[in-house]
Amino acid sequence: MEPTASQGIQYLRGGVEWILKLLNLHILNVKHENKPLLFRLIDLKVYIPSSVSTVRWSSGASSYVILGEYRKMRSAVALLFLLVAYCGGVVHAGEIVAELYHTNVTVKWHTDYERQLVDFSIWFGASTPDVLFLGFSDFGDTNNSDVLMYYNSKKEIKDAYTNRDFKITSDLQQDFQLLRKRKDHIVVRRKLTTCDSRDYAFLPGTTQFYIAASWGSTNLVDIRDKRWVVDKKFGKVIEGPTDQPNIEEEPAALEKDVKVVIVNSNSPDPIPNVETTYKCIIRKMPFDTVNNMYHVVRMEPYVTPGNEHLVHHMEIFMCRDEVEEWSGSCNDPKKPPKSKSCSHVIAAWAMGEGPIHYPKEAGLPIGGKGKNAYVMVEIHYNNPELHKGVIDSSGFQFFVTGQLRKYDAGIMELGLIYSDANSVPPNQKAWAMNGYCPSQCTKNLPEEGINIFASQLHAHLTGRKLFTSQYRSGVRIGDVNRDEHYSPHWQHLQQLRPVVKVMPGDTLVTTCVYDTRKRSKVTFGGYRIVDEMCVNYIYYYPASDVEVCKSAISNSTLRAYFSERHGMDGKRMQISDMYSNVKDWGNGVDEEFYNVLNVGNMNMNCLKSNGEPFEFESKDSRQSWENMARPTFVSGSFITTRDRFQCPAINDMINFE
């Protein structure tokens, strides 16, 4: 019987220790060495140095050196490979359920990273279709996509694709292998990457599944044919390097005294029949948080059934002051004045996400001496079809314990400031914008650093690629989280295993890449669904006072550019009007402006939990949080790949051709 993922990891880690002991090799804990990455074993990054007398690997923020003779070193590496083969590799599993009118079709997968294979088991449910279509794509396109076809009468599969005209065509190279066929399900296998130009390459990030079925018609050749019953789903066939499972795959067990608290709207008022509404709900927690501290160990969205298409995202804030309970528009002038103290964000959720699990060593603190018991939920309703009379009582569900865990957990916002300064020109295929959390802000983190255990990337409709990278001493040392094919319709909290260690003085860069080819006007940075955002909510411990670390291109840079290059009134015009008054972004204008965004000074939000900025310290008196130079980066020998979005070069200008 094949071992489970957690068993395989236990065997591997135990085997590493056994091999080192057997060969009498010694381990030293040292700082990172600049050595080329050779291969990766779970959370062990193994390095082969220029000297043949040592083998190095790193785990977390530390590096280790195995000292020994060359012969023993070769034996150790060989045994490590054998051990990985024995353990069956690291396996990632996932599942989606497609609702197809007659039945629910369930697609499960097991991804074997070591063997570079993925097995799909497809369960037909109550009514097996005559023909099943399973498509894979980055962004949900139904043409130019990879397809697996299954014909029930013949019990046959076919590796196919849809061409630009949506026609289903058999692939010249058949890369799917039928492993099992039963009355109620089939199992197929494929390599993650086949090097076939008609096949989908499974990569870290979101994969969009297009599932279609037909009963009675077996000769359908166009995926747009109305006889198909269709559904779209989202999943991750491959997890990123910090998403690997560890020994503790299950969420931490809840304490016995856990209380369940629901904070939601009990107002009978319907959702307004306008496109964008932000509703605020202020509630008092139903237990004594003035004299006692509690830990939130789990949070779940509480979305009114049937309203999933209207509730776009939610945030919940702690209030510093005692505030009267209230429910209504966040922009209502009758909103309690003291609600301004509700600024400490403790959780965020977006459509498509599940619960937030805290690790066993940490919990989100609520209450304590001198603390108030009030929280505010902010709900963003997206109602483009202007539905009327929809009653909603969505909110958050908390799992709270009085048995305090070792660490207080915190949440921090990274990315771009919500501002029209961060706007995107029209007709751009891959317009990258970077939000910086520089060393001047992260120096306020605890001396021992923080451990990021979860990450939630968020953008709106034109976002296509989102990621946050970590830099130390100007050198990129890895990613916190990355989604190569982001979808605003399936957002999820990514648990990070192992945790990502961030030290004071590190720089975090959050990058969002937008596609505005279908838009004829500028897409402004802002709160509406048609505007754009770029955010990464990171969940971490131990808690710090840093809550917001975001940036924008400085207003002074923008005003100087639009004044000098486009003859606009740089002093009195609104930033949004300046963007709108550029009549033609072609003929090199977009390329020139892209360069301005990447070299101009920036405006920083480095904010405490009370909304106040940290004191700015710089030897350069000309700089401030409102006008500071962006970080500089250098190449390091252990990660030599330049990220073309975070560190642009002339090599990348093909994007503008």
Swiss-Prot record:
Present in synaptic regions of RIC interneurons. Present in gonadal sheath cells of hermaphrodites (at protein level). Cu(2+) B binds at H458, H460, M533. The keyword Metal-binding applies. Disulfide bonds join C280-C330, C319-C342, C437-C549, C441-C606, C512-C534. Keywords: Copper, Disulfide bond, Glycoprotein, Membrane, Metal-binding, Monooxygenase, Neurotransmitter biosynthesis, Oxidoreductase, Transmembrane, Transmembrane helix. Cu(2+) A binds at H312, H313, H380. GO terms for molecular function: copper ion binding; dopamine beta-monooxygenase activity; tyramine-beta hydroxylase activity. Glycans are attached at N104, N143, N555. InterPro entries: Cu2_ascorb_mOase-like_C, Cu2_ascorb_mOase_CS-1, Cu2_ascorb_mOase_N, Cu2_ascorb_mOase_N_sf, Cu2_monoox_C, DBH-like, DOH_DOMON, DOMON_domain. One of its GO terms (cellular component) is secretory granule membrane. Its cofactor is Cu(2+). Belongs to the copper type II ascorbate-dependent monooxygenase family. This is Tyramine beta-hydroxylase. The lineage of its organism: Eukaryota, Metazoa, Ecdysozoa, Nematoda, Chromadorea.
